[in-house]
Amino acid sequence: IALVALLVAVPIGLMAAVYMAEYAKPHVRSIVKPALELLAGIPTIVYGIFALITLGPWLRDLSAALTGGSPFIQAQCIFTAGLVMGIMLIPVVSSLSDDIITAVPKAMRDGSLGLGATRSETIKKVVLPAALPGIVGAVLLTASRAIGETMIVVLAAGVAAILTINPFEAM
């Protein structure tokens, strides 16, 4: 479940962090960053009930519509729990990574741009490698939170933790 959560949270959180740190205008950043940090404060039980009542049945119905018959995703499965946990962890990854990317010295960015690199090349070749140790720490912190969260899994997995190999099968 933590693996599914990390597969959801890390790419989206890193992309949001890069956007906020490098591309967003100060006005947009002043709105988006506090909103993301506010999302990090939502209790786990709220996410669990959201998974149980809304997301699980929606994924089941979507998979039934895609196959034209029986659903291949059950409402209460590892995938649903991991997806909701990933949504819950996006603000953590994003906020920590944004702070780390913002801490990269401006001189490194200016040096890269002065040598003729584009903005995206500077981010890819200079900023992210310089911020990598901190980003890895943020991902490890997020992974430990994902492993530690249990309430969302209990609710989204149908209150019976019988693990199966198939992440789309009901638990």
Language-model-derived ranges and their functions:
Residues 95-97, 113, 119-154:
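Transmembrane alpha-helices
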Residues 9-12, 36-44, 72-98, 129, ...:
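Faces of alpha-helical transmembrane segments in polytopic inner-membrane proteins
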Residues 12-51, 95-96:
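Cytoplasmic-entry segments and transmembrane alpha-helices of multi-pass inner-membrane transporters
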Residues 1-7, 25, 71:
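Periplasmic/extracellular loop-to-transmembrane helix junction in inner-membrane transport proteins
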Residues 11-14, 24-28, 96-110, 119-121, ...:
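Transmembrane helix boundary and interhelical loop/hinge segments in multi-pass membrane proteins
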Residues 3-4, 8, 12, 16, ...:
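Hydrophobic alpha-helical transmembrane segments of multipass integral membrane proteins
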Residues 146-171:
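Glycine-rich helix-loop "coupling/hinge" segments at transmembrane-helix boundaries
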Residues 1, 48-87, 157-160:
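Membrane-interfacial helix termini and adjacent extracytoplasmic/periplasmic loops
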